[in-house]
């Protein structure tokens, strides 16, 4: 029997082998106890402020929306220690692991950002760390592989399946099933079996809480929309959580359109998938008519995931949030534009959200609106990927 509701409407649940149920229930109990323990909360807050660098700024863009009446703000998770929003919830889960008496951490990573965040938290808190990463992603994200190793983590390349994030997730779950007594599985996104979607949201929701307060301070009102990229969905749910009960604020989660939805090479299960069970949860996923998981695709390794967190599935189903998609090309254009106009190099993941915000601003230039984009990470990890693409296309002017 769970202590918290494992479902968001019809989505969520705990669809895992029986052997993992005790580990998930132990984790849920530890989380429920910890969130009501002032000492745990104080330690988490201290790490967020003194180690990670919170609160992060809300930056008004100066040049990007010239010619429009949009005021576009960036929530600067790229300035967080570790380079992305991932550090927030990793510190929370690592503290939980120590509280449960675990000595080892297992993690999966796509772009490598969650792996880096996990490695730094383990180094700080004295935990052993092993990270599963798709072999294809290891190639795409060599700087992050080196960072993880530098901080003492063991990086295990996964060659099965499509050699990407979904395969790394499967291997990490297998490892946890065999070693859950000594190890905690530090899941990197707001997906997977209960209680992970709830835990990750709670350890990421300061993004939206800060953004709301900062927006009131600067604009004396709520934003018209908050916009975030969606792979598994942790940075988006962290931004959305504090705005869900504010009906005047549009919640926009941007999925990766890859080479275009019509090409079939994308990662947009909310817009173009169907319901099913995957990775321990009931959600939307990319599957064929036989229920086989289809390969997702995105230029951004961190969005290359064939499903999505159950709370996003629920928000989509009830019409509270909208989930458009942005192609590789649109994201790459936004990546270059932010760098040239504001001197900020965003992660390719975050560039998807930025691209959609720019569409909103430019499609209605006379509309006075306040938009907040969650700039979920910085683009250092992506410069080699992008340089190769621009070189092939001859597009770096």
From Swiss-Prot:
Its cofactor is pyridoxal 5'-phosphate. The keyword Lyase applies. The modification N6-(pyridoxal phosphate)lysine is found at residue 86. Transmembrane segments: none annotated. PANTHER family: TRYPTOPHAN SYNTHASE, TRYPTOPHAN SYNTHASE-RELATED. The beta subunit is responsible for the synthesis of L-tryptophan from indole and L-serine. This is Tryptophan synthase beta chain. It comes from Aeromonas hydrophila subsp. hydrophila (strain ATCC 7966 / DSM 30187 / BCRC 13018 / CCUG 14551 / JCM 1027 / KCTC 2358 / NCIMB 9240 / NCTC 8049). The gene is trpB.
């Amino acid at each position: 029997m769970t202590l918290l509701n494992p479902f968001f409407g019809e989505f969520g649940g705990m669809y895992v082998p029986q052997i993992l149920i005790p580990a998930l229930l132990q984790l849920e109990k530890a989380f429920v106890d910890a969130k009501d323990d002032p000492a745990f909360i104080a330690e988490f807050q201290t790490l967020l402020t003194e180690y990670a660098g919170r609160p992060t700024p809300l930056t008004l863009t100066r040049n990007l929306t010239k010619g429009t009446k949009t005021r576009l703000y960036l929530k600067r998770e790229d300035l967080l220690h570790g380079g992305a929003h991932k550090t927030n919830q990793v510190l929370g889960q690592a503290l939980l692991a120590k509280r449960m008496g675990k000595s080892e951490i297992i993690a999966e990573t796509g772009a490598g950002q969650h792996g880096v965040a996990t490695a730094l938290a383990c180094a700080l808190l004295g935990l052993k760390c092993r990270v599963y990463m798709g072999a294809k992603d290891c190639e795409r994200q060599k700087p992050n592989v080196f960072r993880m190793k530098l901080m003492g983590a063991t990086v295990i390349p996964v060659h099965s399946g499509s050699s990407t994030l979904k395969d790394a997730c499967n291997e990490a779950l297998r490892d946890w099933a065999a070693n859950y007594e000594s190890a905690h599985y530090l899941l990197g996104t707001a997906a997977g079996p209960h209680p992970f979607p709830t835990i990750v949201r709670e350890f990421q929701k300061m993004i939206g809480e800060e953004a709301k307060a900062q927006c009131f301070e600067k604009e004396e009102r709520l934003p018209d929309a908050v916009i975030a990229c969606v792979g598994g969905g942790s940075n988006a749910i962290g931004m959305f959580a504090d705005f869900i009960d504010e009906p005047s604020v549009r919640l926009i989660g941007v999925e990766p359109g890859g080479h275009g939805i019509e090409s079939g090479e994308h990662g947009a299960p909310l817009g173009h998938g169907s319901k099913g069970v995957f990775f321990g949860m009931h959600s939307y996923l990319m599957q064929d008519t036989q229920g086989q998981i289809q390969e997702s695709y995105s230029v951004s390794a961190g969005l290359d995931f064939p499903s999505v967190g159950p709370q996003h599935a629920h928000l989509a189903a009830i019409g509270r949030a909208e989930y458009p998609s942005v192609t590789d090309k649109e994201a790459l254009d936004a990546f270059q534009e932010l760098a040239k106009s504001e001197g900020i190099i965003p992660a390719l993941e975050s560039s998807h959200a930025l691209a959609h915000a720019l569409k909103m601003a430019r499609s209605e230039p006379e509309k006075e609106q306040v938009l907040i984009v969650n700039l979920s990470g910085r683009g250092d990890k992506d410069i080699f990927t992008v340089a190769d693409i621009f070189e092939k296309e001859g597009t770096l002017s």
